[in-house]
C-alpha cells in the first residue's frame, strides 16, 4: 500500500471507539538512521497565535488493521 492511499482514512481507537482524525492530517515521526516510521501524531498539530494545538502520538506498531476506509489502532 502506498502512503498516499492512507491519507483519506479515519483513525479509530478500537479500545475506546474514539475517532482520532484523518491520517492525512497527521505528522509522521521517522527514525533518521533507519528510515522507519516510529509513530504519527494525530489530530490538529497546527500553531495558532494564542495556543499550540497538540495531537496524540500513536506508535506505528499499535496499528492493528488498515481497512478500505479506516485505520484501527489499539492502545499498548
Name each model-derived stretch:
Residues 1-76:
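Peripheral interaction segments used for macromolecular assembly
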